[in-house]
Design a protein with these regions (language model features):
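N-terminal intrinsically disordered, cationic/polar leader segments
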Residues: 3-5
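Anaerobic metallocofactor- and corrinoid-dependent redox/one-carbon enzyme cores
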Residues: 7, 11-18, 22-24, 29-30, ...
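Flexible, acidic active-site loops/lids enriched in D/E/S/T/G that coordinate Mg2+ and/or position polar
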Residues: 32-111
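Solvent-exposed alpha-helices and their adjacent loops that cap or buttress functional pockets
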Residues: 44-45, 70-79, 87, 95-99, ...
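Short acidic loop-to-helix transition motifs that present clustered carboxylates
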Residues: 59-61, 168, 187-194
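Short glycine/serine/threonine-rich phosphate/pyrophosphate-binding segments
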Residues: 88-97, 102-104, 170, 191-195, ...
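Acidic beta-strand-loop-alpha-helix segment within the catalytic core
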Residues: 105, 110-186, 248-251, 278-285, ...
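Glycine-rich phosphate-binding loop
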Residues: 189-190, 199-227
Length: 324
C-alpha cells in the first residue's frame, strides 16, 4: 500500500485545529462536528478509495463519517483501496470543558486490516512491550498486576493503572487499590491512555476496564506499531445486540481478541494529534507565529514512530517560523 502517513497526519492535524477552536466553549456536539467536517473535507483530497469501517455510527445516525461511507478523491483514478477507522474527536467533553487529553485519531490499512467492531462496550487490558504476554483477561486483577510488576522489575505499589471513572468499574477500582497499585481515574479518553501505556516515560503502566469497542480497535492499531498488547472481549448487553454482532460476522461473542486479531493489517498507519494537552501529546496552540500542533504518526510496513511538531502558517506572509 502507498505510504499514506503524511496524508493521514494532515487529516488529524486539520481536525485537531478545527475542534480546538471550540475548546472550552461547553458544547461537545459542536466540537465533535467541527472535527468531523474537517476530517471529511481533508480525506476527500487524498488520492485513495477509502471506506469508513469504524466511524461516527450507522448511516441513519451520523451525517458524515458513518460506517460504510466512501472517502477519498474518487476522480483521481487511484487504485489505493483502504479501510479507515476514525475517532474525529476522542474526548468531546474534554474539549468542551478545556480538560486535558482530547485527541483526534485515524487509522488506515489495506482492505480487511481492521476488525469491524460494533458500537458497544469492550472489556480491555492494555500493557506496553515489556509486559506483553504477561496478562490474562480472565485472571484476577492482583495476578495481572503481579505479572506486570515482575516484567517491569518494580513493585506493585510503583504501578499506575488508568481506569475510566465509571460506576461499572467500582469493583475493579477496589481490586486494584487492594492489590497496592495506584490508579489514575479519567473521565474520558481511554484510547489516549492505551497509547500512553505503550510509551515509556508517560507514567502509565496499564489500562484496565471496559470502554468503547471502536476505540479498542483503534488502540490495537496503535499498539501494533508500538509493540504493546491489548486483550479484549465484547460486552453483550442484550439479545438484540448479540444479533447485531452476528450480522457483522462476529460468531463467537465471548471470544477474547488479541492485538493482531483486532488490527490484523499488514500495512497499518496510525495518527493522532493533540487537541488539549495530555500525557502523550501537547494540545493545539494558537500564537502570533502560526498554529502549532503536536502529533504521533506510526506505520507497520516500514516500522517507525514519529512525533511531529508542525507550524501551520495559514498563508500569512508576516508569520515567523522559530527554531524550537
Amino acid at each position: 500500500m502507498f505510504d499514506l502517513s503524511l496524508e493521514v497526519l494532515r487529516v488529524v492535524e486539520n481536525a485537531a485545529i478545527a475542534s480546538a477552536r471550540t475548546m472550552g466553549m461547553g458544547d461537545a456536539k459542536t466540537a465533535d462536528q467541527a472535527a468531523v467536517e474537517a476530517m471529511r473535507h481533508c480525506m476527500d483530497t487524498i488520492p485513495m478509495d477509502g471506506t469508513i469501517v469504524i466511524g461516527e455510527g450507522e448511516r441513519d445516525a451520523a451525517p458524515m463519517l458513518y460506517i460504510g461511507e466512501k472517502v477519498g478523491a474518487h476522480n483521481s483514478g487511484s487504485r489505493i483501496v483502504v479501510d479507515i477507522a476514525v475517532d474525529p474527536l476522542e474526548g468531546t467533553n474534554l474539549c468542551a470543558t478545556g480538560a486535558a487529553g482530547a485527541i483526534t485519531v485515524l487509522a488506515a490499512s489495506e482492505k480487511g486490516g481492521l476488525l469491524h467492531a460494533p458500537d458497544c462496550y469492550m472489556e480491555k487490558i492494555i500493557v506496553g512491550p515489556a509486559a506483553k504476554g504477561a496478562v490474562d483477561l480472565d485472571a484476577p486483577v492482583k495476578q495481572n498486576l503481579k505479572s506486570i510488576a515482575r516484567r517491569l522489575q518494580r513493585g506493585i505499589d510503583d504501578l499506575v493503572v488508568v481506569v475510566l471513572d465509571r460506576e461499572r468499574h467500582k469493583t475493579l477500582i477496589h481490586d486494584i487499590r487492594d492489590a497496592g497499585a495506584r490508579i489514575r481515574l479519567i473521565s474520558d479518553g481511554d484510547l489516549s491512555a492505551g497509547i500512553a501505556a505503550a510509551v515509556a516515560g508517560t507514567g502509565v503502566h496499564a489500562v484496565m476496564g471496559s470502554g468503547g469497542a471502536p476505540e479498542g480497535v483503534l488502540t490495537a492499531a496503535a499498539l501494533r506499531c508500538l509493540n504493546g498488547e491489548i486483550l479484549a472481549r465484547l460486552v453483550v448487553k442484550d439479545d438484540a445486540q448479540k444479533e447485531r454482532m452476528q450480522q457483522m460476522g462476529i460468531r463467537d461473542v465471548t471470544r477474547i481478541y488479541n492485538t493482531q486479531e483486532l488490527a490484523p493489517g499488514r500495512a497499518l498507519v496510525f495518527a493522532a494529534c493533540g487537541v488539549t494537552d495530555g500525557n502523550l501529546l501537547r494540545g493545539v496552540r494558537f500564537t502570533g507565529d502560526g498554529i502549532h500542533t503536536q502529533s504521533i504518526v506510526m506505520t507497520t510496513s516500514k516500522p517507525a514512530v514519529r512525533f511531529i511538531e508542525t507550524t501551520h502558517l495559514e498563508n500569512k506572509p508576516d508569520v515567523k517560523v522559530r527554531f524550537r
